[in-house]
């Protein structure tokens, strides 16, 4: 099994840090400090070495230290392809982000070729009651760990969708180019939808197989394209192309694409109660979310033989003793690099003896 883990992390002008240097190894790491000390900022910096905008989905301008024009995050990381140096830097003046792998520029969506990562934050605990966009992105991040090419597909789809919207809204009369774009969107949509469905099948099996202290969930996806595939419809690409063609006039008025895999919703049910997670208590929602993360970690390791980095922000807060102890035993048993934030060690004293403590 390959372990993805950080050997070192360096921050320059990042959030509240002027300069920070951390040396780590493939063990659990506990970041301990008062609220506002920068614990979550460190997790966010690590999460930037995975496709997307990090665990906060922050705008570039917000990650640079106040009054500074640039910031830099550097990591020496044991990746899928071996030991490598990764950097990502931002310039407030140009609003650009540049990511490099061993001093060669790479696209953000290429990061899943090198790294594997899972995170759980307090913000995510509201994912079941927030908009479908957050749940869909959560599902797609899960897919990245099973299929690294999925990130590139999602990025390409969003690019072509933006181009289509621009042509329609600006009334650019180029039917041939529009047709080509819609055909590309349709082909990519087919791959995205199939990847999601395959991953959901893996995940459901993982949830059903894993006996633990957290509630089991039933996972599904509510999307026209995914449903057509499940129903056995043939010529999916042609179907999507036709739908995009038929909605041109409507989308021109709306200024956006009203049909496609970007409208799908990731649905989660409490298995025992047979109700959607959004109708469960906040405590149950957190427990269900943890159960999904555990299943993802467990099955990703079994299926891909790769142990991802796990980032847990204040995850032990409000967990009862039984669930907290189970979670600690489960995670330490996976033999992976685990980053945990906390304001104190109450309830996790034994876990702390096996971890690297970093006080902020």
From Swiss-Prot:
Subcellular localization, as worded in the UniProt entry: Cytoplasm
Keywords assigned by UniProt, alphabetized: ATP-binding, Cytoplasm, DNA damage, DNA repair, DNA replication, DNA-binding, Nucleotide-binding, SOS response
Record Gene3D superfamilies: P-loop containing nucleotide triphosphate hydrolases, RecF/RecN/SMC, N-terminal domain
Gene Ontology MF terms: ATP binding; single-stranded DNA binding
Signal peptide limits: none
One of the GO biological process terms: SOS response
SUPFAM superfamilies: P-loop containing nucleoside triphosphate hydrolases
A single GO cellular-component term on record: cytoplasm
InterPro entries registered for this protein in UniProt: DNA-binding_RecF, DNA-binding_RecF_CS, P-loop_NTPase, RecF/RecN/SMC_N, RecF_2
Positions contributing to ATP binding: 33-40
Lineage top rank: taxon: Bacteria
HAMAP family: RecF
Function field: The RecF protein is involved in DNA metabolism; it is required for DNA replication and normal SOS inducibility. RecF binds preferentially to single-stranded, linear DNA. It also seems to bind ATP.
Family: Belongs to the RecF family.
Protein's name in the database: DNA replication and repair protein RecF
Taxonomic source organism: Rickettsia peacockii (strain Rustic)
């Amino acid at each position: 099994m390959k372990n993805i883990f950080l050997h070192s992390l360096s921050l320059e002008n990042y959030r509240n840090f002027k300069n920070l240097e951390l040396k780590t190894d493939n063990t659990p790491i506990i970041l301990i400090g008062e609220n506002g000390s920068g614990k979550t900022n460190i997790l966010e910096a690590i999460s930037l070495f995975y496709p997307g905008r990090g665990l906060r989905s922050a705008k570039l301008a917000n990650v640079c230290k106040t009054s500074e024009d640039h910031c830099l995050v550097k990591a020496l990381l044991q990746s899928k392809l071996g030991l490598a140096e990764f950097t990502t830097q931002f310039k407030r003046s140009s609003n650009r982000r540049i990511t490099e792998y061993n001093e060669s520029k790479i696209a953000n969506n290429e990061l899943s070729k090198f790294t594997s990562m899972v995170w759980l934050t307090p913000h995510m605990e509201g994912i079941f009651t927030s908009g479908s966009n957050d749940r869909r992105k959560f599902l797609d991040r899960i897919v990245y760990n099973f299929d690294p090419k999925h990130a590139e597909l999602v990025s390409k789809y969003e690019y072509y969708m933006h181009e289509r919207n621009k042509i329609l809204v600006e009334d650019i009369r180029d039917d041939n180019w529009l047709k080509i774009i819609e055909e590309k969107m349709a082909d990519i949509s087919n791959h995205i939808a199939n990847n999601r469905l395959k991953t959901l099948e893996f995940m459901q099996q993982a949830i059903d197989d894993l006996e633990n202290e957290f509630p089991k969930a039933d996972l599904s996806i509510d999307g026209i394209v995914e449903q057509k595939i499940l129903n056995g419809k043939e010529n999916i690409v042609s179907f999507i192309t036709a739908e995009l063609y038929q909605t041109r006039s409507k989308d021109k008025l709306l200024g956006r694409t009203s049909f496609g895999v970007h409208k799908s919703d990731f649905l989660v049910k409490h298995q025992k109660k047979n109700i959607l997670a959004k109708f469960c208590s906040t405590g149950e929602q957190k427990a269900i979310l943890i159960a999904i993360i555990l299943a993802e970690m467990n099955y990703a390791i079994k299926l891909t033989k790769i142990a991802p980095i796990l980032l847990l922000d204040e995850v032990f807060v409000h967990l009862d003793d039984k669930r907290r102890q189970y979670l600690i035993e489960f995670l330490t048993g996976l033999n992976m690099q685990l980053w945990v934030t906390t304001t104190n060690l109450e309830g996790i004293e034994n876990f702390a003896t096996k971890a690297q403590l970093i006080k902020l």
